[in-house]
Amino acid sequence: MDYEMMKKSILAFLLLTSSAAALAAPQVITVSRFEVGKDKWAFNREEVMLTCRPGNALYVINPSTLVQYPLNDIAQKEVASGKTKAQPISVIQIDDPNNPGEKMSLAPFIERAEKLC
């Protein structure tokens, strides 16, 4: 194998491995109360980050503290088993003003986070 061919092979290998690593990295998006709408906003802060981890574990992340909160059962199980450190979602989830005693729905956020998987 000549030098030029070897250089091309190494470059191709590096591109393949770096793109595979990029595909495996969890996706993260930021959503704001303004973007989602005040009537659907479920959190006690103006914006949060959403992420999907391997295995479809969905989390909300507080952008100022980087504390994470499980958004679905898969994420809850990861926290319960000690695989991931997180706080309960109820810490940042607000009450539903139209339904006393109930919290705002997490469905719009679960839907958005699932698109990252």
Task: Identify the meaning behind each predicted range.
Residues M1-S9:
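Positively charged n-region of N-terminal signal peptides that target proteins for export
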Residues S9-S18:
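Sec-dependent N-terminal signal peptides
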Residues S19-L23:
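N-terminal Sec signal peptide cleavage junction
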Residues A25-L66:
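N-terminal secretory signal peptides
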Residues P26-Q27, N44, C52, I74-V79, ...:
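Contiguous interface-forming segments/domains that mediate binding rather than catalysis
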Residues Y59-Q93:
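Flexible, solvent-exposed short loops/turns enriched in glycine
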Residues G82-C117:
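C-terminal partner/receptor-binding element of secreted or periplasmic proteins
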